[in-house]
């Protein structure tokens, strides 16, 4: 039996939380409205602790076995209160008990697109998730964000597993820097006047444009490298993959420089808050 310590209780992935979905829903309503939750609801701290341990347990399960891909960087977290509250207020119809990513696990690895897809399927199969649990955000990225997500709906709760290549991870980390500096609304296509105070709209739009262009460029490179892996003849395939590996290092370095320069120029112009 796989277990995780939650406070003083022992819980496995097949155990349900000690509160009902309806109680968590009411807690979410209270959080969104900025009022004290009903007395029969769990506390926010209890719910977050449960999800933090749930995410950590899934992380341990992933790190504890072998996959088709190697050298995975696996991390986990429970969603912060500020981020969760912003999500509830941005989408008033959303209920706390149905939010998929309160417990989150992230996997970053040096993967080709095909390897990324295969790893997602392996993880979904391992945790008993069906095919619709795999959400591919590569062909239709969200605000430039590209990854493959696996949504787990375990008795113990929901977990979102994000699987990213090193290029997808590089891009996402820079976009997080922008969100921290200019307001997280840029992740949801909000108009500049809705963002953090001190934002220069024209500078922000230029930065977002640079990020969008970089995302498209990285997608093109990854598609080319995947094509190399699909070459029929082994000798040609090995040669093409060798060149792709060299090219990947160059693309990583030039993309990092390009995005760092864009952010630094924006900060120098006074657009960083």
UniProtKB/Swiss-Prot annotation:
Superkingdom per UniProt: Bacteria
SUPFAM superfamilies tied to this protein: Nucleotidyltransferase (SSF81301)
Name of the protein in its database record: Uncharacterized protein Mb1401
PANTHER family named in the record: GTP PYROPHOSPHOKINASE YJBM
Source organism per UniProt: Mycobacterium bovis (strain ATCC BAA-935 / AF2122/97)
GO biological process, one term: guanosine tetraphosphate metabolic process
């Amino acid at each position: 039996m796989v277990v995780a310590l939650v406070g003083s209780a022992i819980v496995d992935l097949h155990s349900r939380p000690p509160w009902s979905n309806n109680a968590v829903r009411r807690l979410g309503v209270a959080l969104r409205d900025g009022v004290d939750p009903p007395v029969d609801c769990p506390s926010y701290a209890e719910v977050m602790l449960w999800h933090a341990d749930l995410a950590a347990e899934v992380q341990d399960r992933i790190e504890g076995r072998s996959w088709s891909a190697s050298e995975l960087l696996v991390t986990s977290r429970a969603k912060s209160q500020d981020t969760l509250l912003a999500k509830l207020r941005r989408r008033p119809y959303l209920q706390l008990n149905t939010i998929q990513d309160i417990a989150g696990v992230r996997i970053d690895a040096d993967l080709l697109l095909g390897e990324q897809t295969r790893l997602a399927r392996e993880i979904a199969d391992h945790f008993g998730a069906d095919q619709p649990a795999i959400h591919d955000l590569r062909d239709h990225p969200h605000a430039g964000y590209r990854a493959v997500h696996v949504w787990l709906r375990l008795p113990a709760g929901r977990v979102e597993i994000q699987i990213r290549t090193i290029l997808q991870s590089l891009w996402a980390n820079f976009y997080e820097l922008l969100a921290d500096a200019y307001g997280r609304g840029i992740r949801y296509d909000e108009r500049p006047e809705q963002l953090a105070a001190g934002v220069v709209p024209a500078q922000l739009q230029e930065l977002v444009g640079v990020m969008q262009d970089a995302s498209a460029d990285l997608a093109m490179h990854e598609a080319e490298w995947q094509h190399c892996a699909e070459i029929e003849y082994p000798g040609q395939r090995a040669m093409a993959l060798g060149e792709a590996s060299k090219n990947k290092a160059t693309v990583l370095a030039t993309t990092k420089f390009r995005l760092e320069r864009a952010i630094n120029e924006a900060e120098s112009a006074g657009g960083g808050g």
